[in-house]
Regions:
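Chitinase-like catalytic core of GlcNAc-active glycosidases
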Residues: 1-128, 148-149
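Soluble or luminal CAZymes and related metallo-dependent hydrolases
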Residues: 66-67, 94, 130-134, 201-208
């Protein structure tokens, strides 16, 4: 059975959606900027949802025990299936301390960003695999761990000149139509040539991401996460529980 893809939603997206995705993740929770503890914990979620905690507000001197207590109460009340720590400040030492404490304390799977996960007894949240990279190469070092994969249809533009290669992200709304398909990298691509350069444009469609997740399942990935504003609905063939 295909692995589930949790669609991450903000509070505003939840309020404005007439029908919620079958599998969703709350992405509005962060460390309080005005005191010790957390801000924007959800009061309600569909049973079986995931909870995402980010460090958009730096941790500073937040108490790990208080954070664990607040999360534990929320998780138990809402029957969440997992906590995703989307931490993006690898130089912040206290972030790792908090992550380690939550992994040891909370009663549900805790999934930690790959920048922090080395040496922790927890699941790993793999950052998006760009369309010019084979997925297996990204996952090899994490074999044997529970793995959640960040998914996106963001593309990549690679410009080759005599000075070398330059890569820039390509937002999903700028991806071209048509193109050729690469079944190994699960992407589409287009090549433009002129006298001085070659431009490789690579992007993923919803069908490409669905194929990517099929390979991810074969490689041991447990679940995926994607932005609701990007995917809008589960991918073709995604598990619905």
């Amino acid at each position: 059975m295909p692995i589930p893809q949790y669609l991450a939603m903000t509070a505003a997206e939840m309020e404005g959606s007439a029908v919620l995705p079958h599998q969703m993740a709350w992405m509005a929770c962060h460390f309080s900027s005005s005191g010790n503890g957390l801000s924007n914990l959800p009061k309600w979620l569909p049973t079986g949802s995931a909870l995402i905690l980010d460090d958009s507000t730096p941790i500073h001197d937040h108490d790990p025990e208080r954070i664990a207590a607040e999360l534990g109460q929320c998780i138990q009340h809402l029957q969440c299936v997992g906590l995703l720590l989307d931490f993006q400040r690898p130089d912040e030492g206290q972030a790792r301390e908090v992550a380690e404490y939550l992994c040891e304390t909370l009663p549900i799977p805790v999934i930690v960003s790959d920048a922090y996960a080395e040496g922790l007894d927890c699941g790993v949240f793999i950052s998006p695999v760009p369309p010019d990279e084979a997925m297996a190469s990204r996952l090899t070092r994490w074999q044997g761990r529970e793995i959640w994969l960040d998914t996106t249809m963001e593309g990549l533009e690679i410009i080759l000149t005599e000075d070398g290669a330059k890569s820039t992200p390509l937002p999903p709304w700028e991806r071209p139509e048509g193109g050729l398909e690469d079944k190994h990298l699960h992407c589409h691509y287009h090549i433009s040539l002129d006298e001085n350069s070659a431009v490789f444009t690579l992007w993923r469609t919803a069908e490409d991401v669905a194929a990517q997740l099929a390979e991810a399942e074969a490689l041991g990935v447990t679940a995926a996460v994607g932005l609701y504003q990007e995917f809008g609905s589960p991918l073709p063939g995604a598990e619905e529980g």
